[in-house]
Amino acid sequence: MSSDKAKAFDAQFPTYKSEFQIPTFESLGIQNSKYSPETNSIYLCGNSLGLMPRNTTELINRELQAWSSRGVEAHFNHSHPQGTDWVDIDLPLLPLLAPLVGAKQNEVAVMGSLTSNLNALLIHFYKPKGKRTKILFEKQAFPSDYYAFLNIVQVFGYDASHLIQIEIPKGETYIKTETILDVFDKYEDEIAIVCLPGIQYYTGQFFDIAKITKHVKTSAPDVVVGWDLAHAVGNVPLSLHDWGVDFAAWCSYKYLNAGPGAIAGIFVNEKYTEQNKPENYKPRLAGWWGNNSSQRFQMLEKFDPIASALSYRQLNPSVLDCVALKSSLEIFNKVGGMLSLRDKSLAMTQFLQDILTKSNYYIEQGETDVNKFGFKIITPLDPNQRGCQLSLLFQPHRDEKKQNVMERVFEYLHQHAIICDERRPDVIRLAPLPLYNTFEETRIGATRLLEALEAIKDDYI
């Protein structure tokens, strides 16, 4: 693909790069005589850690100043005219976050971390009864999810046999929706919870959340449907309320650009938070920040949960984490949310795919020769079945790191400040983000990758 075509796309789709801090060759410690130290990197790694919004520093410094000048009194009397009293620091985030996940404001909360939130939701929603004791999820789930699922069945006295894992069929690179539905139908009478990723972290597959949720709830209304949206929130449009999802959890340090280890979020369908009706209340991991805010500081020995997802909060949230997340959510709000970004995302990832698939080093997904030199795209080639990420599987594999194709390509990219993500042993994930990446950057990144393969091909062919 020519630079002219990339620039034509860039003229069509706006970029919001100026809202973010972009690492340079110098700041990354990369020395390459072909580039000046102040040259910006091409950052295709927002699926691992999003870039820092420029406004984050100002917002965090505002809170540090409030702490410095007011101390504990900033909880109820912030020092800045635009500051939020710390007692309510997370509340301004809710109207910004809810549209990104397609929720009502009373269905979202900012709290904890992804795995701690998933554990809290499982404790609340996993209610094994009779034959319904099992959790259905994917075999290739992120390890932390597996640990959470295994732990919760063990808490109730069961073992790993109560975990049903859906595997990628032999010869395929991802799980088709029909496979998921077939496995559910096979074990329907034994399943208590279905919990899948909105987007699979390794392959980049965008699961059909609406279809899967509807199928499960139609076939077995008592089965709870939850989603790990770590790679979906801020990446693709979501409509959790309208889709009838029961619960979801996500992190904020990837596509939401809230910083490493950032505060996370949850969705709980409002039908579960009508606490004023005793028959609808279910015990959960409770804490004082989920209690009625008007009584919170009365120190009563009575838990009166807030009638919203906020009732799942256990403790007061980190002020610095909340304002870091707010700085990014305000950008999403400013540009019109995910629907306004999705068209660019679809076009940009397709642009990347078109460059790669026209290469002599591209290997079809169904190719079985593992010694053939090049790469496969293990992400669905259908744009509607993925987010912005493409996952490339390089071959042939070599146990020696210095001889492994993926490692050598990754090193070449890094020396040219093409920042992406490696998943050993053989995968590189490329994620052009519509907020701060351009088509020209995407073209250059793909070009450098193909250059790397050209440079080493004689060692394998």
UniProtKB/Swiss-Prot annotation:
Compartments where found: Cytoplasm
UniProt KW Cytoplasm keyword: yes
Residues reported to bind pyridoxal 5'-phosphate: 114-115, 142-145, 228, 231, 253, 288, 316
Keyword check for Cytoplasm: yes
Modified residues (N6-(pyridoxal phosphate)lysine): 254
Gene Ontology CC terms, in alphabetical order: cytoplasm
Main location: cytoplasm
Entry keywords, A to Z: Cytoplasm, Hydrolase, Pyridine nucleotide biosynthesis, Pyridoxal phosphate
Family of this protein: Belongs to the kynureninase family.
Catalytic activity: L-kynurenine + H2O = anthranilate + L-alanine + H(+); 3-hydroxy-L-kynurenine + H2O = 3-hydroxyanthranilate + L-alanine + H(+)
UniProt record, GO biological process: 'de novo' NAD biosynthetic process from L-tryptophan; anthranilate metabolic process; L-kynurenine catabolic process; L-tryptophan catabolic process to kynurenine; quinolinate biosynthetic process
Organism this protein belongs to: Lodderomyces elongisporus (strain ATCC 11503 / CBS 2605 / JCM 1781 / NBRC 1676 / NRRL YB-4239) (Yeast)
Name of the protein in question: Kynureninase
Annotated PANTHER family: KYNURENINASE
Gene expressing this chain: BNA5
EC number(s) recorded for this UniProt protein: 3.7.1.3
Pfam families: Aminotran_5, KYNU_C
